[in-house]
């Protein structure tokens, strides 16, 4: 296992850790019944009725699970 020869300075440590930041997920825009919704691609979305009650999960136009 590699062992550092010298102590790493605080500024170098923080500069290295600054690259660890997370990226925002890319959202897919879909329009249904005149409503625009944004969701994660390749993930099932919740289908709701007019009252907003969750009915089931849908992926690529198919029902995949009950809620």
UniProtKB/Swiss-Prot annotation:
Signal peptide: none annotated. Residues 1-20 have a biased composition (Basic residues). InterPro entries: Ribosomal_bL32, Ribosomal_zn-bd. GO terms for cellular component: large ribosomal subunit. Keywords: Ribonucleoprotein, Ribosomal protein. GO terms for molecular function: structural constituent of ribosome. The keyword rRNA-binding does not apply. GO terms for biological process: translation. The keyword tRNA processing does not apply. It comes from the Bacteria. Residues 1-24 are annotated as: Disordered. Pfam families: Ribosomal_L32p (PF01783). HAMAP family: Ribosomal_bL32 (MF_00340). Belongs to the bacterial ribosomal protein bL32 family. This is Large ribosomal subunit protein bL32. It comes from Renibacterium salmoninarum (strain ATCC 33209 / DSM 20767 / JCM 11484 / NBRC 15589 / NCIMB 2235). The gene is rpmF.
């Amino acid at each position: 296992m590699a062992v550092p020869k010298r102590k790493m300075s605080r500024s170098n440590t923080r500069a290295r850790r600054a690259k660890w930041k997370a990226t925002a997920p890319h959202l897919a825009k879909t329009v249904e019944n005149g409503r625009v919704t944004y969701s994660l691609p390749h993930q099932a979305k919740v289908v709701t009725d007019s009252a907003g009650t969750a009915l089931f999960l849908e992926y690529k136009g198919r029902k995949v699970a009950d809620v």
